[in-house]
Amino acid sequence: MCGIVGAIAQRDVAEILLEGLRRLEYRGYDSAGLAVVDAEGHMTRLRRLGKVQMLAQAAEEHPLHGGTGIAHTRWATHGEPSEANAHPHVSEHIVVVHNGIIENHEPLREALKARGYTFVSETDTEVIAHLVNWELKQGGTLRDAILRAIPQLRGAYGTVIMDTRHPDTLLAARSGSPLVIGLGMGENFIASDQLALLPVTRRFIFLEEGDIAEITRRSVNIFDNTGAEVKRQDIESNLQYDAGDKGIYRHYMQKEIYEQPNAIKNTLTGRISHGQVDLSELGPNADDLLSKVEHIQILACGTSYNSGMVSRYWFESLAGIPCDVEIASEFRYRKSAVRRNSLMITLSQSGETADTLAGLRLSKELGYLGSLAICNVPGSSLVRESDLALMTNAGTEIGVASTKAFTTQLTVLLMLVAKLSRLKGLDASIEHDIVHGLQALPSRIEQMLSQDKRIELLAEDFSDKHHALFLGRGDQYPIALEGALKLKEISYIHAEAYAAGELKHGPLALIDADMPVIVVAPNNELLEKLKSNIEEVRARGGQLYVFSDQDAGFVSSDNMHIIEMPHVEEVIAPIFYTVPLQLLAYHVALIKGTDVDQPRNLAKSVTVE
């Protein structure tokens, strides 16, 4: 969602800030801005509605000079997208950027108005600027003012603040929204995502909940919310920003779809040894914890929730462990009963998804056996706060609609299933079949990608459609859910997914010649049941698009289009059948002319509730 970049150096920092914002564009935003202060305290602020490139053009026309600055990309929450609502916000000499939501901004706004402050935006962020300004007038340093202001704010936020009268210092505060400090030589940086700072440093300090940081060119001091100084470890990051060039591809999403064979190879690297899954990276005590697991609770949002839904079938059928999957935003707001020896698994590409993080923190109070995060970003909040963590190693994913992060999550989950089956003393053939399937998966997906042109032609049938229905059975039902999500995310076609057996319980009423029905139908034990559901659609004139392998015995007809897939091992079929649905959504979006990589109203990493 929103992105923050800050810098304090002996050189001009405007280009550092702009490059940082460019690297955060993938998170989604509607406006951008920056403010730079020189050594004499002269501040220049630029804000633009639209892309970072428009802000960069403005900076070329009006050069910004100064060694201290903060910048921001905004994803509108309070107040419409506009230049007036774009960050940074100013209250006299106080300049603020902010990620998150201040839940009590309205009473604070009224109180500040009563003190004589005038608001020029609709945002909750301007409340922070005026509140810090007010507290500073009551005496003390900027840090003192922030320490007094922070307890008055309710909600999740990450904020960076500068005082133009003291351009040698930046202050930052974290409560529920990530901030990371980048350490340089005679210069220091801060951002909401380490990707923004990779061009200038590889050394980072991740702020923890309640931290307040005071940053100068030569020092970083961190305090807790009482003002007591605390120590935070700095780490050397090996994260690679490898997505800057789309190469031969038109969009990042297309590139990331085609990267999946290699991404899955990376996920598997070092984790299969002598025909067994090797997850020794979990540490020496992991086996003891995992061997006690009698139940699994999975929390996730969006695409990650769909991967959790697939894994439920695997955990129960292959490892014999009961598994529940819940949307994180629902879990955290209801009373739940914790089963005996239940393992909490959280799934998140970014590791910063607000609701998933909140669910993890709640689980620590509820008595879960332990927690395991599956994530694509080392050092993220979810990873740091979990007992165990497994990285998907998918590489940077820029497209808002997740592709390779989803398939690599499933790959990690399936490896975990194999490990648990062994720890439970189940038949060794279970792990053997999983390992064999996973090793074959990259080449199977490469085979499937050769069908791209066929899927591109079929996508033309969707050019005038407003609705679509996806069907699947068993562990392919969550893949139907994921296919529907991809189509609605990037083509803006209303799409729903149902377990095929539910057709006659309502969705069948929607079927007519204008309703395309996409079916995921590998040749498995549920195929005959699924064929009956397909006939129900055919009998009512629905247009069918069936993804299946040749052994399934389907034949194309006027209203049934068969997209023949290579045969794959049953255990990896859910991962495999995801890819053609990604391609279908991509090509439909191209025909519709939408913004594939940054679809409207959506953000890559949802760091607010």
Swiss-Prot record:
<dbReference type="InterPro" id="IPR017932">
    <property type="entry name" value="GATase_2_dom"/>
</dbReference>
<feature type="active site" description="Nucleophile; for GATase activity">
    <location>
        <position position="2"/>
    </location>
</feature>
<dbReference type="GO" id="GO:0004360">
    <property type="term" value="F:glutamine-fructose-6-phosphate transaminase (isomerizing) activity"/>
</dbReference>
<dbReference type="GO" id="GO:0006487">
    <property type="term" value="P:protein N-linked glycosylation"/>
</dbReference>
<dbReference type="InterPro" id="IPR001347">
    <property type="entry name" value="SIS_dom"/>
</dbReference>
<dbReference type="InterPro" id="IPR047084">
    <property type="entry name" value="GFAT_N"/>
</dbReference>
<comment type="subunit">
    <text>Homodimer.</text>
</comment>
<dbReference type="Pfam" id="PF13522">
    <property type="entry name" value="GATase_6"/>
</dbReference>
<keyword id="KW-0963">Cytoplasm</keyword>
<dbReference type="InterPro" id="IPR035490">
    <property type="entry name" value="GlmS/FrlB_SIS"/>
</dbReference>
<dbReference type="GO" id="GO:0006002">
    <property type="term" value="P:fructose 6-phosphate metabolic process"/>
</dbReference>
<feature type="active site" description="For Fru-6P isomerization activity">
    <location>
        <position position="604"/>
    </location>
</feature>
<feature type="domain" description="Glutamine amidotransferase type-2">
    <location>
        <begin position="2"/>
        <end position="218"/>
    </location>
</feature>
<feature type="domain" description="SIS 1">
    <location>
        <begin position="286"/>
        <end position="426"/>
    </location>
</feature>
<dbReference type="GO" id="GO:0097367">
    <property type="term" value="F:carbohydrate derivative binding"/>
</dbReference>
<comment type="function">
    <text>Catalyzes the first step in hexosamine metabolism, converting fructose-6P into glucosamine-6P using glutamine as a nitrogen source.</text>
</comment>
<dbReference type="GO" id="GO:0006047">
    <property type="term" value="P:UDP-N-acetylglucosamine metabolic process"/>
</dbReference>
<protein>
    <recommendedName>
        <fullName>Glutamine--fructose-6-phosphate aminotransferase [isomerizing]</fullName>
        <ecNumber>2.6.1.16</ecNumber>
    </recommendedName>
</protein>
<dbReference type="GO" id="GO:0005975">
    <property type="term" value="P:carbohydrate metabolic process"/>
</dbReference>
<feature type="domain" description="SIS 2">
    <location>
        <begin position="458"/>
        <end position="599"/>
    </location>
</feature>
<dbReference type="InterPro" id="IPR029055">
    <property type="entry name" value="Ntn_hydrolases_N"/>
</dbReference>
<dbReference type="GO" id="GO:0005829">
    <property type="term" value="C:cytosol"/>
</dbReference>
<dbReference type="InterPro" id="IPR035466">
    <property type="entry name" value="GlmS/AgaS_SIS"/>
</dbReference>
<keyword id="KW-0808">Transferase</keyword>
<keyword id="KW-0032">Aminotransferase</keyword>
<keyword id="KW-0677">Repeat</keyword>
<dbReference type="InterPro" id="IPR005855">
    <property type="entry name" value="GFAT"/>
</dbReference>
<keyword id="KW-0315">Glutamine amidotransferase</keyword>
<dbReference type="Pfam" id="PF01380">
    <property type="entry name" value="SIS"/>
</dbReference>
<dbReference type="InterPro" id="IPR046348">
    <property type="entry name" value="SIS_dom_sf"/>
</dbReference>
